[in-house]
């Protein structure tokens, strides 16, 4: 685990998973039974290999095993890949959860 991941866990209770393909980070919103995806990043040369989908599968499996009812994420509208990212999430049955200035929040039920 990197120092940055340790810092985020200690100070913000954010769990980080890193492997040779990239990383993702999650935060538990216990009072809402929701697991929030804080960040997900895949190495550029691997982005056509469905690594993000594999990460989502791991996140949803963890959420189901730990009693979460929903998984959420936010997309920063100023990210140069925002349109593509939103389209992919919405195409995979994520629903609009909220908007917050520069971000759009998405939610998906855990089944």
Where is each model-derived feature located?
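Conserved acetyl-CoA binding element of GNAT-fold acetyltransferases
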Residues: 32-44
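Conserved acetyl-CoA-binding loop-helix of GNAT-fold acetyltransferases
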Residues: 42, 48-61
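Conserved GNAT acetyl-CoA-binding A-motif
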Residues: 63-77
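C-terminal "cap" of GNAT-fold acetyltransferases
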Residues: 97-111
């Amino acid at each position: 685990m990197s120092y940055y991941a340790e810092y985020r866990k200690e100070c913000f209770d954010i769990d980080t998973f890193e492997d040779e393909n990239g990383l993702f980070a999650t935060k538990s919103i216990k009072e809402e039974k929701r697991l929030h995806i804080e960040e997900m990043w895949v190495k550029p040369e691997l982005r056509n290999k469905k690594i993000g989908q594999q990460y989502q599968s791991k996140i949803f499996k963890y959420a189901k095993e730990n009693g979460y009812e929903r998984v959420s994420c936010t997309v920063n509208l100023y990210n140069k890949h925002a349109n593509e990212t939103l389209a992919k999430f919405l195409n995979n049955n994520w629903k609009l959860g909220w908007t917050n200035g520069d971000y759009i929040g998405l939610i998906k039920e855990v089944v």
